[in-house]
Amino acid sequence: MPFIVNTDAERAEMLREIGVENFEALIADIPEEVRLKKALDLLPAMGEPEVKSLLEKMASSNAATCDHVSFLGAGAYDHFIPAAVKTIASRSEFYTAYTPYQAEVSQGTLQAIYEYQSVMCRLYGMDVANASMYDGASALAEAALIALNVTGRNGIVVAGKLHPYTSQVLETYLEAAGDRPIVQNSIEDGIGSVAALETLVSSETAAVIVQQPNFYGCLEEVEAIGEIAKKHGALFIVSADPVSLGVLEAPGNYGADIAVGEGQSVGNAQSFGGPYLGILTVKQAHVRKIPGRLVGMTKDKDGNDGFILTLQTREQHIRREKATSNICSNQALCALQAVVHLSLLGKEGIQDVANRSMQKAHYLADRITELPGFSLKFSAPFFREFVVETPVPAATIIEKMLDKKVFAGVDLSAWGEDGLLIAVTEKRTKEELDSFVSELASLG
């Protein structure tokens, strides 16, 4: 496709219109020392076929899950996404849609968001879900802000092992909110110590936060943690993986006041880290404190169902300092993909995905621990992810496995810890699992 540049006459007309004589006058405010003094080192002009070939060659340097067996996890998982998800989400009515300021003219977009909210409420056992957040980390941080607002208290206690990146986002949000203290509970055998937590939660605690499954893949003692939070009048916030809820209890059923999650694992590809989807759900008591958009269903003057943005006095339509948030855009397309995927799966389908992921993860863990020098780092129960102690550095295993077109897992040394974090989804076959074990045996 040719690019038609501006002519000299057109450039002169534009400069004259904005009131400068020449291009040098236009950039006069840019200091000389920061201006580029030489021509850019660009390739010569190419046609579309040549550009396409060049980009494909550059892209081939990447390793991707389409041609590698992946055991990567730590928040981004290689679950199967039916072709129908992308086909439906790519329809022009959805793909190019943006909720306008007169939102009610976009009934299709609003209904899709309403259905997403309804599905998330059922999945998490909660009363209200918003239209989505940027990602799981921002959803958790916003949940903490809700707790500070609702309780009027100052501190946050993290009960178990939170994802390190999520911890960083939480710290950033709370620092901006007045440098609120965050207390980390001690970790014993991969999960938070309930006994130690008892000594950390007080009448000054706004919320107790737990991730389930946690960063190591282990299952926290969520019911005991929730009881401690309630005893001290703190809100109980759970960050739960949506796929895990196919087999684990919904957070609302064991007392969560706010439940959040990273929605990448339902309907959204790993995509080199984003865009992802932040799930945020609350009990009815906190509906006016929830950030972001809420879609509600009502009747029009003729008695037909209609969808609206509701309770907008919480949001950016009022004075900034009184709003619960100033988020206007959300991850609506990612949310659409999530609700399409979950709708295609249904209740039995999500249970099947969760069960197969869990069973295959435990099969692989059992096989790996039979190898000399390999062992599970923690004895706590896990869902689809676990940490292995290895006889050689995890980085070495990861590097060697790449030659076999295998992503072996996540090296925990990035966070100053030992071990290889391995995740297994329903996509992995028995042959792939057994082959992985054989390759590990040759490295041990």
From Swiss-Prot:
It comes from the Bacteria. Gene3D superfamilies: Aspartate Aminotransferase, domain 1 (3.90.1150.10), Type I PLP-dependent aspartate aminotransferase-like (Major domain) (3.40.640.10). It catalyses: N(6)-[(R)-lipoyl]-L-lysyl-[glycine-cleavage complex H protein] + glycine + H(+) = N(6)-[(R)-S(8)-aminomethyldihydrolipoyl]-L-lysyl-[glycine-cleavage complex H protein] + CO2. Its EC number is 1.4.4.2. It is an enzyme of class 1 (oxidoreductase). InterPro entries: GcvPA, GDC-P_N, GDC_P, PyrdxlP-dep_Trfase, PyrdxlP-dep_Trfase_major, PyrdxlP-dep_Trfase_small. Keywords: Oxidoreductase. It holds the Pfam family GDC-P. GO terms for molecular function: glycine dehydrogenase (decarboxylating) activity. CDD domains: GDC-P. One of its GO terms (biological process) is glycine decarboxylation via glycine cleavage system. PANTHER family: GLYCINE CLEAVAGE SYSTEM P-PROTEIN, GLYCINE DEHYDROGENASE (DECARBOXYLATING). NCBIfam families: PRK00451.1. The glycine cleavage system catalyzes the degradation of glycine. The P protein binds the alpha-amino group of glycine through its pyridoxal phosphate cofactor; CO(2) is released and the remaining methylamine moiety is then transferred to the lipoamide cofactor of the H protein. The glycine cleavage system is composed of four proteins: P, T, L and H. In this organism, the P 'protein' is a heterodimer of two subunits. Belongs to the GcvP family. N-terminal subunit subfamily. This is Probable glycine dehydrogenase (decarboxylating) subunit 1. It comes from Chlorobaculum parvum (strain DSM 263 / NCIMB 8327).
